[in-house]
Amino acid sequence: MLDQIIQTKKDRLNTLKEHYIINEHLDLKPTKFFQTLFESSNVYKIIGEIKKASPSAGIIKEDFDLLSLAKNYISSGISNLSVLTEEDYFLGQYEYIPQIKETLDIKILQKDFIIDEWQIYHAKSIGADCILLISEALTKAEINLFIKIAKEQGLDVLLEFHNEDEITKIADVELDVIGINNRNLHTLKTDINHCLHIRDKYSDQLSRFNIVAESGFSKKSELEMYKTNGIDLFLIGESLLKGKL
């Protein structure tokens, strides 16, 4: 599935570049996305995800109301959002981020499939505080370049991976936070224990990172299990959107 999404993104990029004008006069001070997350007083520090659909779940919210969802997250104590902007498979829109930012004071991770440095400048231009990089979609050189560009723009970076083969690519990146996805983006299968397994198996390489556990959480007991095992940072979407958590 990941390869298909990336190919679609490549096909769309030229059109996107023609359609969107990058604002070059932006405040490049650090956005402090992760600092805000770390400073949360919540037992579980959750990045709440907003998305209308996904390849694994189909339509998640038929009655999709962007601002109501964001306000509900804020009222529940969530200080950081992840907003899907990918159009074809998640039915996202780039306009979602400025729409939220114009109304609400909250940190936003742009959730998309970044394969070109232009997308980083665009993320900054629309008001994102943090970008997602997917290790499986990028070379080691691209990862390092994109992190450098993001930092120059004042953006935080969440670099995520699923496959343990990616460890060699990410072990020495200049980041303090890393995401481990419980979902295999090629098969879309989810293993709720995957993040803990990878963290423990590669503890020498990963011990310096704050780890964000991503995908598959549907019960409070699962969050408790992770916290007991030393991880209290989470990225959760579907279960929150459906009211399961």
Q: Residue locations for each model-derived region?
A:
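C-terminal helical cap(s) of enzyme catalytic domains, especially alpha/beta-barrels
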Residues: 192-202, 224-227, 240-245
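A structural alpha-helix within SAM-dependent methyltransferase catalytic domains
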Residues: 74, 98-101, 124, 147, ...
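Glycine-rich phosphate-binding active-site loops on the catalytic face of alpha/beta enzymes
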Residues: 125-142, 179-188, 217, 229-245
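Conserved N-terminal beta1-alpha1 strand-loop-helix module at the mouth
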Residues: 1-108, 115-118, 140, 151, ...
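Catalytic cores of alpha/beta
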Residues: 115-127, 162-174, 204-236
